[in-house]
Amino acid sequence: MNILDQLDAKSLRDDVPDFRPGDTLNVHVNIVEGNRSRVQVFKGFVMGRQGSGVRETFTVRKVSFGVGVERTFPVHSPIIDKIELVSRGDVRRAKLYYMRDRHGKAARIREKRESSASSK
């Protein structure tokens, strides 16, 4: 293991939940305005994940006042306070770029139903 791999391993976060494209997330982001810092929540669905390791990013999309807003976050960034998984989505694609062209009911993502082994 070389020096760069060791530095990358130190920078990885261990509190990242297991999320996939289609899942709905609350991303708590630290915003610095002048000398004050506050936490802003960005809620939307995951459009995709790119990269691996320290350089891994994910894109979250939401519709705010009729305007689609997409934001790309580094997974292991220190500006992210925490990531909450709200619900799981049932999709068949790794990248949900087709959702940009959908409006209204067509823009909905089915919720994934968890199968329980104890119900048999």
From Swiss-Prot:
This protein is located at the 30S-50S ribosomal subunit interface and may play a role in the structure and function of the aminoacyl-tRNA binding site. The gene is rplS. Belongs to the bacterial ribosomal protein bL19 family. GO terms for cellular component: cytosolic large ribosomal subunit. It holds the Pfam family Ribosomal_L19. HAMAP family: Ribosomal_bL19. This is Large ribosomal subunit protein bL19. The keyword Ribosomal protein applies. GO terms for biological process: translation. InterPro entries: Ribosomal_bL19, Ribosomal_bL19_CS, Ribosomal_bL19_sf, Translation_prot_SH3-like_sf. Keywords: Ribonucleoprotein, Ribosomal protein. The lineage of its organism: Bacteria, Bacillati, Actinomycetota, Actinomycetes, Micrococcales.
